Amino acid sequence: MAELTPMMKQYLEIKKDNPDSILFFRLGDFYEMFADDAKLASKELDLTLTSRDHGKNAKPEEERVPMCGIPYHASESYIARLIAKGYKVAICEQMEDPATAKGLVKRDIIRVVTPGTVIDAACLDDKSGNYLCGIYLDSQGGGAAFCDLSTGETHLTAFSGKDTLTHIINELGRFSPAEAILSDGAFSEKALTDVLTDKFHCRYENGGERRFRLAEAEKNIRAQFGEEAFSRLPAGEPAAAMALGGLLNYLYETQKTDLSHIRELDYYRQGRFMELDLAARRNLELTETLRSKEKKGSLLWVLDKTKTPMGGRMLRSWLERPLLSVTDIDRRSSAVAALVDDTIRREELIAGMTGLGDMERLIGRIVYGTAGGRDLTSLRAAMEKLPNLKEQLSGFSDRRLTELTAELDTLDDISGDIAAAICNEPPFSVREGGIIRDGFNEEVDRLRHILKSGKGVMAEMEAKEKEKTGIRTLKIGYNKVFGYYIEVSNAFKEQVPETYIRKQTLVNGERFITQELKDLEHEILTASERVVALEYELFSALRQQIADNAGRIQKTAAAVAECDALCSFASVAVHNNFCRPEVDESGVIEIREGRHPVVEKVLKDSLFVPNDTFMGEKEERVAIITGPNMAGKSTYMRQVALIVLMAQMGSFVPAKYAHIGVVDRIFTRIGASDDLSAGQSTFMVEMTEVSDILHQATKNSLLILDEIGRGTSTFDGMAIARAVLEYCADKKTLGAKTLFATHYHELTEMENTLPGTVNYNIAVKRRGEDIIFLRKIIPGDADRSYGIEVAKLAGLPEKVVQRAKVILKELEDENGVQYVAARKETDQVSLDAMSEGEVLDAIRRCQPDTLTPIEAMGLLYELKQKLNK
């Protein structure tokens, strides 16, 4: 086998230290990939796969090394595609100039790009954070840390007790991490790794105990965030520090650069924000719809009218983390109210923020050392909008807006420095020159002058030498052998100064050089390289100067982001006729003419019908809601939940009036979202979710329960539904505010026996044999289920519908309700091997009021099949 070339030996040594990454190996103007990396990259990136000899004196029959490559200046888009597919990419750069290197060019890894450590704009969503997560779990509790490397934003929380894993999974829902580093304890929890894979499509790896050592974690936290931030962590509860320590260790190992923009640590404990489990986030469609997984049609789609990327990210974070403190809620909603009341100034603020660049991510790239000239001009353009924003904000008397005015630094000095140094339209690359503005640096100007007018410079020197020596025939020439020279005819050679050095004797004269001429020649011939190097040096110095002010810029960016998010809330409130809710700790939820914020936006052919809601601390704590499917029960219940959530975000709400007593959690059990991919039955999924809700809810929670017990037999389902309802309503067991939709009409009797329970139903208007859903919630229970009418609306064949009406009439004539009340579970309907008489008996035993529309349709279909036989 042929001996490996020095370059291939170097490649294999570097690859050995990065076995889990695709290695981008810099060779000249390309990043090359070899062997298995080349095969994988060529497939994923649609690159042509070639090959090369792997050693010296390789024989033709010896196997060649697979190889593919990409231009280094176009690498961002290729890296983005690999990261989107979950790969890690190790960037190996040339650490010295190949032109001056002695022997093999030194190369090393400058960073490893992973899904959770991306900073390039091509890989990121402007209005979503990109979080790396560190999770530590042991028998005592656990911690979770989240960091968006592109902005430096860092959050940390910890839990203890038996529900730690559940709480941490709920925290994952707030941040939707792109990548997770797990301790041994966390890595062994299948429930956690399944959620990371199935729900978040998140790359994860076992960080091992090495990355999560407590002493090293505490040292790194102190160094990164400062002593004051470290002191806020809970003493005696190391899980938080170890989670953050594992995350920091991973960053240090993969990034190999300055991370000083990661400086502010947000440590929060349970009880600061409303906790939402994954089911509630999914069912309430907070950031994406259930079906299409798109933003359009979600609550975020309605609320997000922000004008800046950082404002969009902040508004999303408010949606993911509704507040529990009445003081904090009031502070935010007061700012929104002030903006609502001052239309002119609000619109001027919005106009001023339109098109303002992503200052948070720009300063992240600047500190990171990857920002180019265009990033600096974008930052300058954003900064130039700040004085006007500050002036507009200063006109408000609201406390929070006044604080934002003070926090907003106009950064005139930094924008001025950028304007002075960087040209208006800098090139893409910072290493090719043309980035520094004319007039900023004398040496750059001189070298550019030499480049642009080399002949002119020599002509100037020729004129100067003629004048100095008095030799009229003196001239400066150039050839490839001697370079530039001074030629003097024989008639004047006696006048040549002693400083002239003879280089060549001619028939008619002599050729000389001077030190000044040689220096000028060197400048002309090397001016291009020197001006490019000097421009990069000046640019790097300016970039570092800006990086040194990262704290100022981040604070201002946060102020702009908050102003943008508040203006979005105000604009949405004005354009959608929202009201400011009263928020307190009364335990009361009172809503007058409430509307679903999303449904009312997507309705095209009809107006949304508003509804009232009252849920007290003692009376009307539990609402049993009956009525046919398609009538609006689920929409109404989601509407109440969303209004409560919006109020606790500090937003105005879609209602004429709203009084919201703070709830600590919102739970939802809505069957339409059943995910059966794990192989569990619908009923098992339902019971698991209900179990989680009953174990985690408190008396201050809001429960949305839709069709509990629908996935099993009639009596089983009714028994479970009643038991759940009693558990929720009874203050001795739970006593939580509950909206409980059901098709089990027998449960409506509980209004008379279960304190705090009240019946509501969806109003229906009959017109001949047709029905019209009025979408209005009214007191009392539904008089019937309207299952056949729903089947007709769904398009069931008319013959089946008419037959169903006949069967229903027969059952009603036989007073089926009394019969059902007395029957036992052993009387379940069986359709196997029935005669016509047995089919009729089955119909007689059936109670349509206890069937959902889908169950009724299924029963009709099977009965018809048996009769046909």
What are these regions (language model features)?
Residues 172, 177-185, 191, 206, ...:
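Conserved catalytic alpha/beta cores of large enzymes that bind or transform nucleotide phosphates
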Residues 329-332, 352, 356, 454, ...:
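Intracellular alpha-helical coupling/juxtamembrane segments of multi-pass membrane proteins
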Residues 141, 212-222, 274-278, 286, ...:
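Amphipathic heptad-repeat alpha-helical coiled-coil/stalk segments that mediate oligomerization
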Residues 1-338, 354, 358-367, 371-460:
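Charged catalytic and DNA/RNA-contacting regions of genome-maintenance
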Residues 92, 115-124, 258, 394-400, ...:
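Active-site phosphate-binding and catalytic loops of NTP-dependent enzymes
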Residues 372-375, 848-869:
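Short, amphipathic C-terminal "tail helix"
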Residues 38-54, 147-175, 494-525, 605-615, ...:
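Extended active-site and interfacial segments that coordinate phosphate-rich ligands
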